[in-house]
């Protein structure tokens, strides 16, 4: 015998190591595991660790050519999920040498690439990742970050205001540019291409970029404020995407946009590097995220996708609203909003944060609240998200009975009123409606908006809630 014993052995004999002390350089993962009936949780957790690192289903002789102890993932702790039958949180530690430096693509391919189709598991969800500083430092991260963006735009002490141009598809480039101009002239900081506006027959990208740039400069000249429009550079190839970003830079506009999940992390990181080198801000839309993160027991939680985006690079990212038409439970949302903005975030299970995360010097990302929000939500949004955020009202601007510019005026007046009231020490949660009503007295545009949307509510329970 040469010391190689062929055959199949239980994963837990090699990959379940409850005595393991995690290292500062390990990438730590928290998986929500639902094993098949009859599979013990230790075996399920060990299987996840094995299949997402060095293991396969049988012993192979080439295992003897390397040091498995150095390279294997380890399931080092298992907790039962309170209130759920047959669900466990399995904590897995991965040695840093398993991952290519500066590659979110490789990190995800390793950790979630194969294991989610594993037969011994009924369902699997990646709840959180701890990225060690040693790995964080291999990433450029956001092209500019929150402070540099404020300096570029010369806007301080309040959230920024945006608007997605609707109808999202079907407008000609000239009419699209007109809608952009009216919104920006009315007082918004940004307007936005919808995520599926790329380069379709009714509006080719180059025409849209030109008319939007014209709208931008006209609105800037009239208002004396710096304006931006998120020009969506997402395309079918990376080369085409960069070509669009180059054209945006040549036009002198401040910001471009990318759909990072449909476009992919490799494309996103390439674009983020281009944006830093050329002074462009980068707005990130999370189209397709709910396919991955909506189910509570299977997939990847958005806080992981948010961390991945901060590493890959983006200056803004959509992060739910807590109050509008799209998913977003308050404590969970605030948990990943902090992970986007702050340098250091403590473990806090009450907000779904499984690990303490130290971002060292990686710039922060502005969370974007968008989806079914309007002027009545302004006090809540100002209080929940604070100054370092972008509040985006699509229908809540363009749906104004008097048109786009008055819709923009209404939002800007409501925001300024809320910020002023907060700075005076008033309680936005308690007095929010009164603050908006007072502001209506000297803004007919706001009064008209308040009248239109006074009855609108989206009362559905959040699907993804904290474990009780």
Curated annotation (Swiss-Prot):
| Active site (record annotation) | 166 (proton acceptor), 285 (proton acceptor)
Residues bearing the modification N6-carboxylysine = 192
Query: From what superkingdom does this record's organism come?
Result: Eukaryota
EC main class here is: lyase
Coiled coil ranges: none
Protein known as: Ribulose bisphosphate carboxylase large chain
What keywords are annotated for this sequence in UniProt?
Calvin cycle, Carbon dioxide fixation, Chloroplast, Disulfide bond, Lyase, Magnesium, Metal-binding, Methylation, Monooxygenase, Oxidoreductase, Photorespiration, Photosynthesis, Plastid
């Amino acid at each position: 015998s040469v010391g190689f014993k062929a055959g199949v052995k239980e994963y837990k004999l090699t990959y379940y190591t409850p005595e393991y002390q995690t290292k500062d350089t390990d990438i730590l993962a928290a998986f929500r595991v639902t094993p098949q009936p009859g599979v013990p949780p230790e075996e399920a957790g060990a299987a996840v660790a094995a299949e997402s690192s060095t293991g396969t289903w049988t012993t192979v002789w080439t295992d003897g050519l390397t040091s498995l102890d150095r390279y294997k993932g380890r399931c080092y702790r298992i907790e039962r999920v309170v209130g759920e039958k047959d669900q466990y949180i399995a904590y897995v530690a991965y040695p840093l040498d398993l991952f290519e430096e500066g590659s979110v693509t490789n990190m995800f391919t390793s950790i979630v690439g194969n294991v989610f189709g594993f037969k011994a598991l009924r369902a699997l969800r990646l709840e959180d990742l701890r990225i060690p500083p040693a790995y964080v430092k291999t990433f450029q991260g956001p092209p500019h970050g929150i402070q540099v963006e404020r300096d570029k735009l010369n806007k301080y002490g309040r959230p920024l205001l945006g608007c997605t141009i609707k109808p999202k598809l079907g407008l000609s480039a000239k009419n699209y540019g007109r809608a952009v101009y009216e919104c920006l002239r009315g007082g918004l900081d940004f307007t936005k291409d919808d995520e599926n506006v790329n380069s379709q027959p009714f509006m080719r990208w180059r025409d849209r970029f030109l008319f939007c740039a014209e709208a931008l400069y006209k609105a800037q000249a009239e208002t004396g404020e710096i304006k931006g429009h998120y020009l969506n550079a997402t395309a079918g190839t990376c080369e085409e995407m960069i070509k669009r970003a180059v054209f945006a830079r040549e036009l002198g506009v401040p910001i471009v946009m990318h759909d990072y999940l449909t476009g992919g992390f490799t494309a996103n990181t390439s674009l983020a590097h281009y944006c830093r080198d050329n002074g462009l801000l980068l707005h990130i839309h999370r189209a397709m995220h709910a396919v991955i993160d909506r189910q509570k027991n299977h997939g990847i939680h958005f806080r992981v996708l948010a961390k991945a985006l901060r590493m890959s690079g983006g200056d803004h990212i959509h992060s739910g609203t807590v109050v509008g038409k799209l998913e977003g439970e308050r404590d969970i949302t605030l948990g990943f909003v902090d992970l986007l903005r702050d340098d250091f975030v403590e473990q806090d299970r009450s907000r779904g944060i499984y690990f303490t995360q130290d971002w060292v010097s990686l710039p922060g990302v502005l969370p974007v609240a968008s989806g079914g929000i309007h002027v009545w939500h302004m006090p809540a949004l100002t209080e929940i998200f604070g100054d370092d955020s972008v509040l985006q009202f699509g229908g809540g601007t363009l749906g104004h009975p008097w048109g786009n510019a008055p819709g923009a005026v209404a939002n800007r007046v409501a925001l300024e009123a809320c910020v002023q009231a907060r700075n005076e020490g008033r309680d936005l949660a308690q007095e929010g409606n009164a603050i908006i009503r007072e502001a209506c007295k000297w803004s007919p545009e706001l009064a008209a908006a308040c009248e239109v949307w006074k009855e609108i509510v989206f009362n559905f329970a959040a699907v993804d809630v904290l474990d009780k």
